[in-house]
Amino acid sequence: MATPDGEQVWAQLQPQDRAWLNDLSRRAGPDTELALVGGAVRDALLGQTPLDLDIVVAGQDGQGVEALALASGLPFVFHPAFENATLTLPDGRGADLVRARREHYPQPGRNPEPLPGTLHDDLRRRDFGLNALALRLREDGAPELLDVVGGLRDLERRELRPLHDRSLHEDASRLVRAARLAARLELHPAPELLAQVPDALALADDTPRLWAELKLLLAEPRPGQAARVLDGWGAGTLLPGLPLLEALDVQQNAGTPVQPGTYAAAVLSAAPDAAALAERMALGERPAALLARALSDSYFAPGTPELQLRGLLRPESYLPLTGREVVALGVAPGPAVGRALAHLAGLRQSGAVRSADEERTALRAYLGANPKAT
């Protein structure tokens, strides 16, 4: 492909984003270097419209970053630990102002210690080459595309390449992030990435961010596809329930929406210790509650998450008779309906009925033995 330039990236941004980035550049001053970095540049080069914007601020300390956020006129929250600021754009999206830094990992899996750095330092600390591209913003003149680590070559090859041989050792969550990107953008792993997978797996328990990344994986457009990528890389043990996740993907592909919570419940159904996994991934209580309802004999309407899961976990299950149906079969409206449904529920729980037809037969026998129910 032709070598891309900054104008190509700039053109992919939304007009309102170009406007406020221009305004930010004017307010930054001559001693400050600003650059749009990471996923926004990558996605723009892939022909997509970037929505998540990260801007590196070089030449300023934390006070300078906070002052620039204030000068933007947008609501913001300042994060002192990394001297970053999160702006709230008019449409509700967030945009991060990130002080240029280097990073030191005192211990694998733990948060890195930030150190002052240049724009080039900031790009070299990133996870993969195609995420280390930058668009240098200028108050006057065309934006400049920067590639200091060979990210353009990786993007052309659609290859995920870690930037050094201890990348996944320092932060094993990069393994899951790579799988998410590979599934979403149809990327493949560089040999250097696959070589580091065993190291990442060995450090998974010591890397809280890895479990947070797995939760984010369940919110991907096709979580089953991302889980299949992990499995293909030899990391399938991180996320149980692959066949269920892929089956839910099939439902999505057929036009039936599937919520992240349904995927999470499917994972818990296959976990040796569901409670421990839910806590580690910070899933909250809802997926476990959804799973319990799906495994119950309660009635749920077609298309509900409970029924989506039940069809996978209990393929022999069926839709029990409803109150309207038992009335149509001869039960008198009123309290008799509840008693008839309770009788059928007891038969289901005992295994005495295993289909809607068997419920109808059992209901007729019930009515014969209880004529007052008619």
From Swiss-Prot:
The lineage of its organism: Bacteria, Thermotogati, Deinococcota, Deinococci, Deinococcales. This is CC-adding tRNA nucleotidyltransferase. CTP binds at residues 39-42, 126-127, 131, 171-180, 209. One of its GO terms (molecular function) is metal ion binding. Mg(2+) binds at D52, D54. tRNA nucleotidyltransferase involved in the synthesis of the tRNA CCA terminus. Adds the two cytidine residues to tRNA. It catalyses: a tRNA precursor + 2 CTP = a tRNA with a 3' CC end + 2 diphosphate. Its cofactor is Mg(2+). Its EC number is 2.7.7.-. One of its GO terms (biological process) is tRNA processing. Belongs to the tRNA nucleotidyltransferase/poly(A) polymerase family. Keywords: Magnesium, Metal-binding, Nucleotide-binding, Nucleotidyltransferase, RNA-binding, Transferase, tRNA processing, tRNA-binding. It comes from Deinococcus radiodurans (strain ATCC 13939 / DSM 20539 / JCM 16871 / CCUG 27074 / LMG 4051 / NBRC 15346 / NCIMB 9279 / VKM B-1422 / R1). InterPro entries: NT_sf, PolA_pol_head_dom, tRNA_nt/polyA_polymerase.
